[in-house]
UniProtKB/Swiss-Prot annotation:
Name listed for the protein in its UniProt record: Methionine--tRNA ligase
Keyword list, A-Z: Aminoacyl-tRNA synthetase, ATP-binding, Cytoplasm, Ligase, Metal-binding, Nucleotide-binding, Protein biosynthesis, RNA-binding, tRNA-binding, Zinc
Major enzyme class: ligase
Domain of life: Bacteria
């Protein structure tokens, strides 16, 4: 019985419209595109959409700094984003914007339904207000002196030096990060989405078995700590959609951003005329809906988004496909090191298929971080794609073209071997379907080894010199070309550009179902180089270019210039500080904070709990476990919103991604005093 084609809608998270696409972003779009291309090869009807996330205070302020209207800025950024995605052959059917008529209408519709169903609550809150700019200030737009450690220039919600969390009103000498003015407290009525009302539904959805285990486990932690009502409005001035019948109130960007998935699809429906919006978004839709997202936005997509859809009588996602972060050479992407590489910069130097292949070879269905090791990247692409796959074609095509006028043999030299290759279609398809592209690549490369071993053993270059063996030569080389065809069919979802050149060379389309029948008596075209090796020097040029692109056009600064040495203290003052070697037993995220990590430290007979503001530099806290560090052990315990912090770990750096946890030399033991 023929398999019934599925109808599938696939989305990627919407890139924010105030910056360029970089190689970290590309992981998600490549992963999704590989899955989409595979589904299309299998005959499923897939609609693949995305859009720019184009609202919010950061966009409004950046446009002001540039001296242009936000609409102009987001239009220019959208053009750049679409050019980058096209350069990487991301096969979107539609790329739209959240700043659209469709999104405005759908946001108003969903809000209206939520309000009518009793899920919108009003209450008055107090916020800091910039009297010069005439705007309420989000926590991140207030800076001042930390009330705990007295570090200057700290954000309004968290100290990046000591890790303390607080409200903006607790800052010493707070200033607006927008104007520099001293903010004042003002009250404002805000609208809240009653997320706790959907707790039972969300827990049932979590336990349905569809979600990744890591996502379900994380959601259970949020349920255990209790869901809170969600503030969905912001006050003017704000770049976004005004709330209906509420002048001066705007939808918070995270309300209308996921609705952008619906808006982008509605726009596609209107363009095409043959798509039914309700077939994919209606309450009882039988189609599949999948969101590819990063682990940093699971909270919004696994709680708020399905609750919003449920409360407004729309369907929920079939599943969320969540991936980890990208590191480069084992560390966070760095502008100073040149590893913060823009997509556009990459495309100036290298073939997009190279990165697509490398990511595919490392991706699985788990939420694991992917390391783009640039030396390994060069070697893997050159060995796998060039040496194993493309070389298989070049080793055989020359003889076919020169000795047999481009005509393949009428019979298959080794039907049993060929069947081994085609039998692998089932397991490779299962791997692709389950987003285990790394597993698929491993199986494909194992077959490539077998194919090359066959050619090595048959030695067509030797046979070609022997009289009376033209038929053998023809059969061997035709077999090699047919094995190459099967391999490239399996790689088609990953390598679209190479596939296009391969189809032109083989003079046939590569389809999943056609590999059962080998190419016999078939004419191929003259062989031309299908793929170029990567030169490490080219990669180094790209890194150097990224350093130049990202270098600030300001005077050269350094740690001492940026952070001068403080006033001299006496030896007696210093002697009061008791620093100890500590072993990090456990490191984990702190729910409700995007700055803190919770560390459990072993001091050699005593265990301490510490909250440290180092999350921005260590996106995978598990990597810290088992590591030695230095802590201040006699600091008075500090009660924080998340618990009691019993000391402080020592780190260097200006903050953000450039925080470096100190470690002792080898031989140091937990509990040893630092003198």
């Amino acid at each position: 019985m023929a398999q019934v084609a599925k109808k599938i809608l696939v989305t990627c998270a919407l890139p924010y419209a105030n910056g360029s696409i970089h190689l970290g972003h590309m992981l998600e779009h490549i992963q999704a595109d590989i899955w989409v291309r595979f589904q299309r090869m299998r005959g499923n009807q897939v609609h693949f959409i995305c859009a720019d996330d184009a609202h919010g205070t950061p966009i409004m302020l950046k446009a002001q700094q540039m001296g242009i209207e936000p609409e102009q800025m987001i239009a220019e950024m959208s053009q750049e984003h679409q050019q980058d995605f096209a350069g990487f052959a991301i096969s979107y059917d539609n790329y739209h914007s959240t700043h659209s008529d469709e999104n405005r209408e759908l946001s108003s519709l969903i809000y209206g339904r939520l309000k009518a169903n009793g899920y919108i609550k009003n209450r008055t809150i107090s916020q800091l207000y910039d009297p010069e700019k005439g705007m309420f200030l989000p926590d991140r737009f207030v800076k001042g002196t930390c009330p705990k450690c007295k570090a200057p220039e700290q954000y309004g919600d968290n100290c990046e030096v000591c890790g303390a969390t607080y409200s903006p009103t607790e800052l010493i000498d707070p200033k607006s990060a927008v104007s520099g003015a001293t903010p004042v407290m003002r009250e404002s009525e805000h609208f809240f989405f009653d997320l706790p009302a959907f707790s039972d539904m969300l827990q049932a959805w979590t336990r349905s078995g569809a979600l990744q285990e890591q996502v379900a486990n994380k959601m259970q932690e949020w349920f255990d700590s209790g869901l809170q009502q969600w503030d969905i409005t912001r006050d003017a001035p704000y770049f976004g959609f005004e709330v209906p019948d509420a002048p001066g109130k705007y939808f918070y960007v995270w309300l209308d951003a996921p609705i952008g998935y619906m808006g982008a699809f509605k726009n596609l429906c209107d363009k095409r005329g043959d798509l039914d919006f309700d077939e994919f978004w209606g309450k009882d839709a039988k189609t599949d809906l999948y969101h590819f997202i990063g682990k940093d936005i699971v909270y919004f997509h696994s709680l708020f988004w399905p609750a919003m859809l449920e409360g407004s009588n729309f369907r929920k996602p079939t599943n969320l496909f969540v991936h980890g972060y990208v590191t480069v050479n084992g560390a966070k992407m760095s502008k100073s090191r040149g590893t913060f590489i823009k997509a556009g910069t990459y495309l100036k130097y290298l073939d997009a298929d190279c990165l697509r292949y490398y990511y595919a070879a490392k991706l699985s269905s788990r939420i694991d971080d992917i390391d783009l090791n640039l030396e390994d990247f060069v070697q893997r692409v050159n060995v796998d794609i060039v040496n194993k796959v493309v070389n298989l074609a070049s080793r055989n095509a020359g003889f076919i073209n020169k000795r047999f006028a481009g005509q393949l043999a009428d019979q298959l030299a080794d039907p049993v071997l060929y069947k081994t290759f085609t039998d692998a279609a089932t397991s490779i398809a299962d791997a692709y379907n389950n987003r285990e592209s790394g597993k698929a690549i491993r199986e494909i490369m194992a077959l490539a080894d077998v194919a090359n071993r066959y050619v090595d053993e048959q030695a067509p270059w030797v046979v070609a010199k022997q009289e009376g063996r033209d038929a053998d030569l023809h059969a061997i080389c035709s077999m090699g070309i047919n094995l190459f065809r099967v391999l490239m069919t399996y790689l088609k979802p990953v390598l679209p550009s190479l596939t296009e050149r391969t189809e032109a060379f083989l003079n046939t389309e590569l389809t999943w179902d056609s590999i059962e029948q080998p190419l016999l008596g078939h004419s191929i075209t003259a062989f031309k180089a299908l793929f170029n090796r990567i030169d490490l020097d080219k990669v180094n040029e790209m890194v150097a270019s990224s350093k130049e692109d990202m270098a600030p056009a300001t005077r050269v600064t350094g740690p001492l210039a940026d952070d001068p040495i403080q006033e001299t203290i006496s030896f007696d003052d210093f002697a009061k500080v008791d620093m100890r070697i500590a072993l990090i037993q456990q490191a984990e995220f702190v729910e409700g904070s995007d700055k803190l990590l919770k560390l459990t430290l072993e001091l050699g007979g005593e265990t301490r709990q510490i909250f440290s503001g180092i999350r921005s530099a260590y996106p995978d806290p598990k990597a810290l476990e088992g590591r030695m560090t230095v802590m201040v052990a006699n600091l008075a315990p500090r009660k924080m919103r998340f618990g009691v912090s019993e000391g402080m770990v020592i780190a260097a750096g200006p903050g953000g991604s450039d925080i470096f946890l100190l470690s002792p030399d080898s031989g140091a033991q937990p509990g040893m005093q630092v003198k």
